[in-house]
């Protein structure tokens, strides 16, 4: 009797989810998805109660999983997220978010109940199997056919800025996205080519000496002075302020919030945003990178650079090593490879940024067997981790932070965050001083990969930007004698690699990088922020349809 009460409750919950859909197309896809799940279990088990229980409970699981992702990542659940879920190398992340860990454990328990509940009820025999197979095939065919309907596609795409709130629309519609296909943009490549060729050449900026290039992806980093505090006593942070060696500094458009660092890595290394790939955006390190034909690292290698990635996470985490290999890196190292006292299989969540800079110095000094015979200029790409959450919720208000409508726990989290950024500032200034002391040409770049929430609160920021929660900062410093002059006041992360090459006095080595640098000039550093939508579409058409940078 209790089991049937639960069955009724879960079924009612599933019906409520369907009734509360926000779009007409969601009703269709929610009903067909429910029928698909029901038919699949009925086809296998021939037990109608088990099939109803499976589909109803799974609807609840999917809705809760969707809300869990929005809670932590402020992004909707898409089918490509399951690339990350099924890769066990990523599971350690849950240990650092106890709320998420308990939530996932609860969802797994519900999933087990969905699969095994009512497994001892009477079978309908071959008739049940046949009806289930018919429902399964028909519902799948309907979802597959209508997932490419222009009206359905437009409704779905329009819903994504609102957190993609209808998960039962997101999942069927994003299923086609798990199969890689070249992005298709309506535009005119020839128009872009004409604008690109009309630009003046920067041949005078080219350097005969190729400097070492160090780039730091600063985890979860936004200059805390950008928060709109009514009162604060945060010390000056020199890494964000103009210095004698600062050659470029601007706000930076990133394409993720509160996590998914690999999306920012992708934009920087590939030179195109993950958003170009639609539903595959969450899985670009798995499903898109192998198809790329160009990018920053391949251009640097063509210039003779030896390229090294240094990560505090394991080589398998988020498929990093495989992705870096495809990008063109010669070597990926972890701090453990350079003497850090921890097993090579351990993700270093608490390693300080100062220690990461120490190992960066060791790479530049070639203190690793794989580097001993390297006589090329070096590109070192390093990721920090200490700035990552979670943050202390009981810390004193050390920096006297005040902001209306922000709770005590959020203020505590912001204090913890700020002290980590202060330590990061010391680490960045330390590596910058070291690079100067070497008396060799260098270019040092650093950028924040995304913003974060503080006890689930998102503090308002200074500045008048579209999507202000997706803006960090990018800074380049150098001792190179160069004629480089900053032209952009705002930069998309996809253009950061080209800016670094320009500062270093390096020419583009392929047509993609030439186009990337040209578009940066033509659009004043903007992509999705550009007011010239036709120029943007012409550029994208040139990249994907003419140059075929992804195949």
From Swiss-Prot:
InterPro entries: Alkaline_phosphatase_core_sf, OpgB/LTA_synthase_biosynth, Sulfatase_N. Signal peptide: none annotated. CDD domains: LTA_synthase. It comes from the Bacteria. Pfam families: Sulfatase. GO terms for molecular function: transferase activity. GO terms for biological process: lipopolysaccharide core region biosynthetic process. Its main location: membrane. SUPFAM superfamilies: Alkaline phosphatase-like (SSF53649). The chain crosses the membrane at residues 1-21, 25-45, 99-119, 124-144, 266-286, 490-510. It is a multi-pass membrane protein. Keywords: Cell membrane, Membrane, Transmembrane, Transmembrane helix. It is found in: Cell membrane. GO terms for cellular component: membrane; plasma membrane. This is Uncharacterized protein HI_0275. It comes from Haemophilus influenzae (strain ATCC 51907 / DSM 11121 / KW20 / Rd). The lineage of its organism: Bacteria, Pseudomonadati, Pseudomonadota, Gammaproteobacteria, Pasteurellales.
